[in-house]
Amino acid sequence: MGKKHKKHKSDKHLYEEYVEKPLKLVLKVGGNEVTELSTGSSGHDSSLFEDKNDHDKHKDRKRKKRKKGEKQIPGEEKGRKRRRVKEDKKKRDRDRVENEAEKDLQCHAPVRLDLPPEKPLTSSLAKQEEVEQTPLQEALNQLMRQLQRKDPSAFFSFPVTDFIAPGYSMIIKHPMDFSTMKEKIKNNDYQSIEELKDNFKLMCTNAMIYNKPETIYYKAAKKLLHSGMKILSQERIQSLKQSIDFMADLQKTRKQKDGTDTSQSGEDGGCWQREREDSGDAEAHASKSPSKENKKKDNDMLEDKFKSNNLEREQEQLDRIVKESGGKLTRRLVNSQCEFERRKPDGTTTLGLLHPVDPIVGEPGYCPVRLGMTTGRLQSGVNTLQGFKEDKRNKVTPVLYLNYGPYSSYAPHYDSTFANISKDDSDLIYSTYGEDSDLPSDFSIHEFLATCQDYPYVMADSLLDVLTKGGHSRTLQEMEMSLPEDEGHTRTLDTAKEMEITEVEPPGRLDSSTQDRLIALKAVTNFGVPVEVFDSEEAEIFQKKLDETTRLLRELQEAQNERLSTRPPPNMICLLGPSYREMHLAEQVTNNLKELAQQVTPGDIVSTYGVRKAMGISIPSPVMENNFVDLTEDTEEPKKTDVAECGPGGS
């Protein structure tokens, strides 16, 4: 066997010296948790220590072999001492390695600062803002996030300006967008979810009004409105109240507000508020219960209880007000003859248009109900009817004959470029009708010679004389002779009228017989038109004012017809607004009617029945027949206009 070579002393710790110890990093993220990361893998560290242990075991085996070979050496105590020394040396080496590793970890560990990082600061500020928000604001923000998810293109995120959409401010008077709604939520301008719902509807309807139905903005607004109404429906809001904590808090805060209001208005408000709080606690307990049916039943019971208590409170308040009035206020019985027909549930009514009577079909003042009165504004489509346009295939276009003048024998005689019938059919049409139907007067002799001199006219007259055997010239002579006689007759009539007007004296200086003659003369000069006679100057002024108002109304109607009959531009869906002339005429009519109404009593303008009908008061039929006067019936004979002179007191 060959001789074993001993390892050199420098080779014993070669692996331990050149293998670098792994670096460890200590990271602190947010809280107090510490994670350790090492540059070397854990397997590498374990392999390092395993190699050391194997190396020590290998030494022990060698020592055992040596001991077996040194059995002849006497003295077991010496062997024990050697073993103890070696074991102590091993322990010291291990302690030294562990101390060096701890020092390396301390050198590589980062310095931990006491200042918190930036992210926890921002998160804490956001939490503070969330804590400061009311439950209603949190609920509205939650709904806004759901609504904005339905607008992926962000069409409604920011306000629309006239630079983006021309004429937007003229058409849309109340703009709305998501950013404005968020600002309102931040400023706590919304008092309920219904106000947010109304603004959302306004935003979608504005986009549908300004844009045409075929645009992407119109379709996006319609889709957003459909999905948003589902999000803002009562069922979805109730489910949110059961699933989200701050929605339940929103319900509690509403009840607390209602309780404080009722406590301030009534005498026993404290008990009522405690009852409200108990009901709120019961409802919160019901919301926590797992069964949905029990929740609905509890909510229904609480609502019924709240309504009944509210009715009792209102009844007590009414009784107390009636007692405090000292007999001025009394309870009206239900079976009274007068009542409001258009009364709303909240007690309000509407004022209708003043009209004296209700005409029947066939009467002169009857106004039939039209479709525009019963239907509202068009939600989609255009505001004008489609104009009629004849199809080009239905129009017959014959060939066009050409004339180049002299020396054009070999030129083409007709042009069939735009013709849709053959030449034979065109000749048949020309032979039947003589000329083109669109231009019937182009071949007229007089229009053809309109710009010519006298000589062509003489030639044309002679040609017509030949055709009519002299009848054309005789007709021209008769026409020339009749014209001077008519002119002389009209001149004599004008001079006679001027003489009569200058010779007549003013009507104030004439007696009754001369006034009758003057009236008869006026009737003659007005060609038989009856002249209206006034009893006083005030009546004449009043009638002139009425005539002026009638003229203004006609002008206003003409201006409106002109505006509404014009075709609007294709980029506008809405109708054009009233012009300045229409506004001015309407203001003049209003002022004239106001002046006329100030000069008469209210009974001359409208009847008692008309006022009561406008207020919605129903009156029994016999009383109604005796109280109103029909102001719309036409008279057979012309009446003289009478003006009621009223004093300053209106009597």
Curated annotation (Swiss-Prot):
It comes from Pongo abelii (Sumatran orangutan). The gene is BRD7. There is a cross-link at K21, K52, K127, K186, K197, K201, K212, K241, K305, K307, K344, K389 (Glycyl lysine isopeptide (Lys-Gly) (interchain with G-Cter in SUMO2)). PANTHER family: BROMODOMAIN CONTAINING PROTEIN, BROMODOMAIN-CONTAINING PROTEIN 7. This is Bromodomain-containing protein 7. Residues 47-57, 70-106, 273-312 have a biased composition (Basic and acidic residues). Residues 35-45 have a biased composition (Polar residues). The modification Phosphothreonine is found at T514. A motif (Nuclear localization signal) lies at residues 65-96. Residues 58-69 have a biased composition (Basic residues). Acts both as coactivator and as corepressor. May play a role in chromatin remodeling. Activator of the Wnt signaling pathway in a DVL1-dependent manner by negatively regulating the GSK3B phosphotransferase activity. Induces dephosphorylation of GSK3B at 'Tyr-216'. Down-regulates TRIM24-mediated activation of transcriptional activation by AR. Transcriptional corepressor that down-regulates the expression of target genes. Binds to target promoters, leading to increased histone H3 acetylation at 'Lys-9' (H3K9ac). Binds to the ESR1 promoter. Recruits BRCA1 and POU2F1 to the ESR1 promoter. GO terms for cellular component: chromosome; nucleus.
